[in-house]
């Protein structure tokens, strides 16, 4: 009789990585749509799916433990050169990611931002490719500077960065083509809104 994989090993199974890859593709195809990953631990599952020994990875805030580094076998580098960057969304950005080049805009970094919660909190209105009219995404634990910097980083489209927001078990993608506007009806004094 086959026993189910433990939570720790689930992310490293080929079948789970295929499932997560499809969920990531759906998330990028329909920006702001929240996808729940079976088995939880969205960060581990996303990294196990996207990163391998050919990828460059930065973890400037040391969110990953040593065993994850060893399993991924990714080439660790500074955030400014990395294809994938793991960061705490509640902290302001402390680096300038790679934006790609006009010849190879796909070399722009993908930011994996760990947030407190998707589905409640600050409301963002999204428009752009993959969104029929507007899509609303609510998020808790995303520092406003990420959205401010995102606007600057993506200003020279097709250069820019893509973002994957994740809480414990869910993901939502913000491709560089998506326009994000904070819902000002919920803004409090001193809040800002972003169009990016």
Feature annotation, model-predicted:
Residues 1-56, 60-66, 70-71, 169, ...:
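N-terminal, charge-rich interaction modules
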Residues 54-55, 62-186, 193-196:
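Internal, well-folded beta-alpha domain core
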